[in-house]
């Protein structure tokens, strides 16, 4: 198992799905990084703030969020719990210096917070960038033969997906704060129905980390997969066109460098 090689790590996750082996993959991307660092994080309709850095960009309703350090420490503590948790089959993706806005110092900061490198640490970008075409063409088709739950934005048109969803847990804007109750909803649904062998897809920003941590910790007989915005072009959502280079590269043939970016463990 080589989770530090961008392509081999994808193969490892893909083969687990093919073989119906249960696992969890949870992503600690730049947003989670800033929350762990206790920085103010804001994605608004026309601008962003990350600590002392701010700028202009377009964020549609499904992408908007805000973490206020003075108000939201509970959610930071839960995110830290999820990040520090180690368990067989619990794979955690972190930021690397391949993303220039992250830098090597933040990669090293995450490793230090974690207590050092670990076999279960891999890339937060594992399913995107140069691996994204494989997600669409190799991984997503496997969902058609499985029982699926989906944590997704209420604006998503789930009917457009090329596979069936047994149940959708709808979330809204700033779901990591406003929809924390969904963690218990997912957990209770799994427990009540004694589910085994399901795939739980999560497209819910930092709420995905909470759901995956709390549910997999108690029941590792299902697979939990943080897919971020990977399916957004199929869901009648528009925000990805402004903020997701790997998606515009694949779906719109845009000349974004993210479409061919191979992340490196450094």
Regions found by a protein language model. Name each.
Residues 32, 205-207:
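Short beta->alpha connector loops
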Residues 43, 182-187, 238-246:
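Short, surface-exposed amphipathic charged segments that create phosphate/polyanion-binding patches used
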Residues 52-57, 168-175, 225-231:
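A generic structural motif
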Residues 1-163:
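Electropositive, gly/pro-rich neighborhoods at or near active sites that engage anionic ligands
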Residues 199-203:
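Short catalytic-loop micro-motif centered on adjacent basic/acidic residues
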Residues 207-266:
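C-terminal functional extensions of proteins
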Residues 8-10, 74-79, 181-191, 207-209:
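A short, acidic, amphipathic alpha-helical segment used as a generic capping/interface helix at domain edges
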Residues 156, 162-197:
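A mid-sequence, solvent-exposed acidic-amphipathic segment
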């Amino acid at each position: 198992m080589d989770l530090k090689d961008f392509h081999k790590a994808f193969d490892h996750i893909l083969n687990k799905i093919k073989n119906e082996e249960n696992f969890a993959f949870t992503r600690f991307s730049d947003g989670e990084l800033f929350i762990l660092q206790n920085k103010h994080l804001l994605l608004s309709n026309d601008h962003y703030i990350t600590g002392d850095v701010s700028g202009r960009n377009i964020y549609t309703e499904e992408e908007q969020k805000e973490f206020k350090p003075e108000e939201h420490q509970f959610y930071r503590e839960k995110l830290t719990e999820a990040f520090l948790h180690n368990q067989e089959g619990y794979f955690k993706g972190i930021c690397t210096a391949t993303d220039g806005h992250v830098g090597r110092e933040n990669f090293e900061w995450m490793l230090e917070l974690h207590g050092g490198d670990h076999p279960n640490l891999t890339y937060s970008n594992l399913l995107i960038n140069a691996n994204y075409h494989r997600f669409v063409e190799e991984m997503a088709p496997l969902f058609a033969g499985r029982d699926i739950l989906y944590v997704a934005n209420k604006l998503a048109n789930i009917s457009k997906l090329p596979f069936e969803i047994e149940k959708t847990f709808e979330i809204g804007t700033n779901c990591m704060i406003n929809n924390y109750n969904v963690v218990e909803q997912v957990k209770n649904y799994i427990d009540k129905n004694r589910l085994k062998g399901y795939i739980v897809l999560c497209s819910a920003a930092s709420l995905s980390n909470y759901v995956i941590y709390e549910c997999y910790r108690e029941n590792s007989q299902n697979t939990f997969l943080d897919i971020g915005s990977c399916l957004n072009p199929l869901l009648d959502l528009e925000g990805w066109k402004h903020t997701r280079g790997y998606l515009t590269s694949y779906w719109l043939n845009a000349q974004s460098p993210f479409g061919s970016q191979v992340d490196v463990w450094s």
